[in-house]
């Protein structure tokens, strides 16, 4: 999970972790984890929190070392990023689905792809469209569009 976060995110988590590791033991307890998660907008009851911590507490100490803490926090950061991306892609799709039918013609998608990469020739575009329009309908629905954009 740590490799899915950028340097700034890891630095922010390190700062939060160090700030709550008052005794400088290199580990924080469950209560502190709960406080940090609340600060991140994530509130859980005691049982759910225990399950989350048990999931990432590799050494079973009941305390989270920094790497374990990052694994836990990354779940929320990555989920938030994925949600934001899905929302942006839905907006982009809606711009091209002017009639609101829930799909865009592959011809419109070709235009979009050409704008994104001017080096694509007709054969490249046909190959890409063939991969995206999995049902061969000549249209691309939101799920196909989402798959193309997120790979």
Swiss-Prot record:
GO cellular component: myosin II complex
Residues that bind Ca(2+) 2: 133, 135, 137, 139, 144
GO molecular function: calcium ion binding
PROSITE patterns: EF_HAND_1, EF_HAND_2
Physiological role: Troponin is the central regulatory protein of striated muscle contraction. Tn consists of three components: Tn-I which is the inhibitor of actomyosin ATPase, Tn-T which contains the binding site for tropomyosin and Tn-C. The binding of calcium to Tn-C abolishes the inhibitory action of Tn on actin filaments.
Similarity-based family: Belongs to the troponin C family.
This protein's name: Troponin C, isoform 2
